[in-house]
Each structure stands twice: as structure tokens, then as C-alpha cells.
């Protein structure tokens, strides 16, 4: 994939068409550890971890200082203080995501090829159980309000809910389309992107029903999702290079932020009020609301294929995963052996 650099400052109009007014300004690619962006965000470091397997979602336990990385058939665990691999969770075939329930001392994976979720101990990383899910579990989240884990099953167009403590499946939620990422607000609501219908659905995590559907037009095929729970805003990264801002209280999209190509994850930092979009073209979009419905955004150069991210709430740094690929080696391309790395962006 090619890298495209740019800086955007845009005032976003609150219209039904979600129009924006702004201009692109040339970006200066700062050297690693340098600061060439107006926002102050830049690549702090790149750490090569190597190891086998491709990757999907990342999850950070900021309190325990651990980073969890899905690696096709296993989960790699990294110490955030030393940048060293400190553990591995095997037997997670087709793993996509990792969810954590720190108060229960448990973690959970979504195993897309096995149609299961692996339960593991957060301290020892030992596997302590397995749960059968719907077909093709992709995103997985923990909802602290209901103390339930939700897997969002792309092949089944539904979500499986199970009790985080017992591992008992408590229900299935039909979603009316193929889900992508989701997030819980901590108050009993779960919000999930539906990529096939370009919507966000609201789920009651206790009743296990979809209570609302929100169209994201003009956003198309949303993948990444992040939640500003305090202000009831849902950020959805869409395939047509915009991040929609959905006000769930108002029931409508109130703004759109232009982003880079090939987004697959989003983040929101409640400590700084900054929203992020990790783009496979090799950029991280950084956006901040400057007035109601108006955002200022900037693209920070990262690395090609760095399209998933996780946020460290302690340092406010963003972690992205990527690797090198052999040129013209087919589709999909072959990864260069032991080239897997994390890219850390911060101030």
C-alpha cells in the first residue's frame, strides 16, 4: 500500500449531507522522535517484535502495562514498560480481538476460525475455558454494566453474549447485518457498526435486544468504532475516507472528519478529547472538536498497513501494528519473516 501524507484543518458543517469546509496543507514527515505536526503528535518509536502470524486488533491494559496483539493463531503479550514479549496465549485459531475484564482477572479472545472465545487468566495468561460463539466472531468486548462478554459474529450477522465469570452463553442478538467493531458505554448500552447496512446499532446489554438503529450516511461500510461515552458520541471509520460523528442523543450524524484510506480501527481518549483513525495507507488521523460539530484534524505519517490501533490511557500514546511485506509476492502478500512491529505515536 502506498503512503499518502497530508494535514487537514476542517470546519465540519452540521447538515444532513454532512458537508465540511477545509483545505489540505502539505505535511512534513518528521523523523522518528521528531515533532513535525501542528498537533504535536508524532512517531515516538518503532519496536520490532517479530514472531509468527498476521495481526488484527490490539488491546491495552493500561493499569497492568500490557499490550495484547492478535497473531492469527495465538495472542502475543508485550510489557509496555520494556517493549518486550512477556507471554503468549496459544490455540486461538483465527483470533481477531481481545477483551479484558480486570475486575474478574479474566481476558477473552474471539477465534474467528474456531467459532469460539478463549478465556484466560490475566496474571498467568493460562487458558481457563472456552465458549462456543456464533459463526465468524470478529470484534469482542466486555461490558462492565452487565458483566457480559459480547462477540460480534460476521458470518452469522449476530452477537453472542456470555457471562464473563461463568462463561455461560446467555443469549444471541440478531443484528440485521454484518457487524464490525463495537464499544460499551458502561451504562448498559453497546454500540456496534453494521458494515453491510452502513449503520450503528444500539444494544441493551441486559435485555439483549437492538433498541435503536442509526444510519451513518454519507458514511459507507463502517469498520472501526470509538465511543465518547460522556458526550454520547460514536466515531465510526468508514471506507469512503470519512469518520462520522454520531450523536446518539440527537439520533443523527452531526459531523464528518476526512481521514486516510483503509481505516480499520478508531480510538477516543477521554483524557484529552482527541479521536483517532488508524489508516492502512500509513497515516493516523488525529481529530479534536474545536466547537460544537466542528473538528480540526491532521494526518500523522505512520507505516503502511498500520490500520489497527489501541490507546494507552496512562500515557495517551497510540499503539499501531504492522509488518513488512515482500514486493509482488501475490495476494495476499507474504510477510517478511520477523518484521512484525509496533509503531508508537504520542506527543
Task: Describe the role of every protein-language-model region.
Residues 2-13:
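Bacterial N-terminal signal peptides that target proteins for export
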Residues 4, 18-20, 25-347:
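Predominantly soluble domains enriched in secretory-pathway, periplasmic, or organellar proteins
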Amino acid at each position: 500500500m502506498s503512503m499518502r501524507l497530508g494535514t487537514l484543518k476542517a470546519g465540519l458543517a452540521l447538515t444532513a449531507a454532512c458537508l465540511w469546509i477545509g483545505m489540505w496543507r502539505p505535511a512534513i514527515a518528521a523523523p522518528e522522535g521528531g515533532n513535525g505536526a501542528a498537533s504535536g503528535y508524532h512517531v515516538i518509536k518503532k519496536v520490532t517484535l517479530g514472531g509468527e502470524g498476521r495481526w488484527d486488533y490490539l488491546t491495552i491494559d493500561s493499569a497492568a502495562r500490557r499490550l495484547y496483539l492478535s497473531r492469527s493463531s495465538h495472542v502475543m503479550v508485550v510489557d509496555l514498560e520494556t517493549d518486550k514479549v512477556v507471554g503468549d496465549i496459544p490455540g486461538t485459531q483465527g483470533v481477531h480481538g481481545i477483551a479484558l475484564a480486570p475486575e474478574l482477572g479474566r481476558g477473552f479472545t474471539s477465534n474467528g476460525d474456531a467459532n469460539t472465545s478463549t478465556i484466560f487468566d490475566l496474571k498467568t495468561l493460562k487458558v481457563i475455558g472456552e465458549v462456543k460463539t456464533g459463526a465468524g466472531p470478529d470484534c469482542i468486548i466486555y461490558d462492565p454494566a452487565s458483566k457480559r462478554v459480547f462477540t460480534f459474529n460476521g458470518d452469522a450477522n449476530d452477537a453472542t453474549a456470555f457471562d464473563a465469570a461463568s462463561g455461560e452463553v446467555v443469549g444471541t442478538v440478531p443484528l440485521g447485518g454484518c457487524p464490525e467493531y463495537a464499544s460499551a458505554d458502561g451504562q448498559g448500552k453497546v454500540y456496534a457498526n453494521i458494515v453491510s447496512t452502513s449503520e450503528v446499532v444500539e444494544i441493551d446489554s441486559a435485555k439483549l435486544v437492538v433498541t435503536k438503529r442509526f444510519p451513518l450516511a454519507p458514511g459507507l461500510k463502517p469498520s472501526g468504532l470509538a465511543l465518547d461515552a460522556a458526550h454520547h458520541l460514536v466515531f465510526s471509520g468508514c471506507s469512503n475516507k470519512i469518520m462520522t460523528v454520531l450523536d446518539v442523543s440527537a439520533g443523527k450524524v452531526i459531523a464528518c472528519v476526512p481521514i486516510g484510506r483503509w481505516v480499520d480501527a478508531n480510538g477516543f481518549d477521554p483524557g484529552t478529547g482527541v479521536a483517532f483513525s488508524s489508516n492502512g495507507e500509513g497515516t493516523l488521523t488525529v481529530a479534536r472538536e474545536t466547537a460544537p460539530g466542528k473538528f480540526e484534524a491532521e494526518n500523522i505519517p505512520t507505516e503502511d498497513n498500520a490500520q489497527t490501533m489501541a490507546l494507552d490511557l496512562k500515557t495517551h500514546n497510540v499503539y499501531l501494528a504492522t509488518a513488512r511485506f515482500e514486493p509482488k509476492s501475490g495476494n495476499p502478500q507474504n510477510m517478511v519473516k520477523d518484521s512484525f512491529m509496533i509503531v508508537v505515536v504520542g506527543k
